[in-house]
Amino acid sequence: MPNIPAHIIQARQEVGQKIAAEKLPSWAACPTIQYPARLSMEQCSSEWTARYKSQLIKGETLVDLTGGLGVDCCFLSESFTHTTYVEQQPELCQLATHNFASLGKHIHVVNAQCEDYLENMQPADVIFIDPARRDNKGGKVVLLADCTPNLLDIGNKLLQKCQTMY
């Protein structure tokens, strides 16, 4: 990853590997997986949760509008023919691109704001969206209007673009 000092990358790998050993065992078993900053590791779904979600929905096309580290998207993609991962943070997109390839997944990665991508996207069978539940100071939020993206603001557009929202 460009512009990140090697010692920071090494520290992230060590911390990420420890967290993944418990939370994402199949990722931990893949020696080429690259890990993000600790907060992204702590906030991502566990492998077991992501596998459970993947049993609940299936279809032709899936769009994950809040990709994050890509754990949910990775496992959900097993139930879809075409999967698109959308994430606003460039570094997470770089990691997802690398990690999906390392895991043999064919997932289209898009670096964009959820709202911008949603505006112009083709309809999908399923839209997966897991909004951030922290404010800009890192505090937890509980109201839908305080999540990012604000589901109340984009709810109608989401319903126009998919058969199922999860």
Annotate each predicted stretch with a short phrase.
Residues M1-Y166:
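SAM-dependent transferase fold signal centered on methyltransferase-like domains
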